[in-house]
Amino acid sequence: MIEFEITELNRRLANLIVLGKVVEADYTLTTPKLKIKAGDLKTAWLPMLTQRAGSDLSWWPLEIGEQVVVLSPSGDLAQGIVLGALNQLAFPSIGNSADSHKQVYADGAVIEYNRKSHHLSATLPSGATTTLVSDGGVNITGDVVVTGSITASKDITDKTRSMQADRDIFNAHTHSGVRTGPATTAIPNQSQ
């Protein structure tokens, strides 16, 4: 009897914290679940930890092949919870600075912020698009450089006037002193 109890205690102790890999995932459930393989052991469906699950929510699920930690209350793997991923040879660390927060996606997209250099970078793969919906407006403080075309569905205005006002001046302006030949005209009667 005591041997059985010691064996059971040893099994439970060994199952308190288990390292394994995600081998199955079901993201369709209200509480997404994973199956983990650790050596010859394969768990039942277990819930995975998320960053937020209250009035604010987050979604970035663990995937098949990721190395994880399973924490099992009382050493009962049926009650286990899958904690976050661990780097491994197949998926090494992508950073080497405590000042950098970096996310790299499977399609090549990279989003990184460095708090020391105060630099935010978002690089998307070729053909990617970006949508920002902010019906209250967007305010940018600082110089803006655009490489490529700018399209606007409404007028564009600077500190002097709008582009439409400039077009109106250009289309309606006149010059005095107009003569034929090589001479130039006087300045416009209405400044731009």
Tell what function each PLM region has.
Residues M1-S117, P188-Q192:
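Exposed beta-strand/loop interface patches that mediate assembly or binding
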Residues I2-L13, I156, D166, F170-H173:
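Heptad-repeat coiled-coil amphipathic alpha-helices that mediate oligomerization/assembly
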Residues Y113, L120-I140, V144-D168, R179:
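Low-complexity, small-hydrophobic/phenylalanine-enriched stretches
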Residues S58, G84, Q88, V146, ...:
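Short, electropositive, low-hydrophobicity segments enriched in small/polar residues
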Residues I36, Q51, L77, I81, ...:
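Generic detector of intrinsically disordered, low-complexity, polar/charged segments
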Residues T7, G108, S162, H173-V178:
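Generic signature of intrinsically disordered, low-complexity segments enriched in small/polar residues
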Residues A172-Q192:
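Protruding loop/beta-arch "assembly-hinge" segments enriched in small, turn-prone residues
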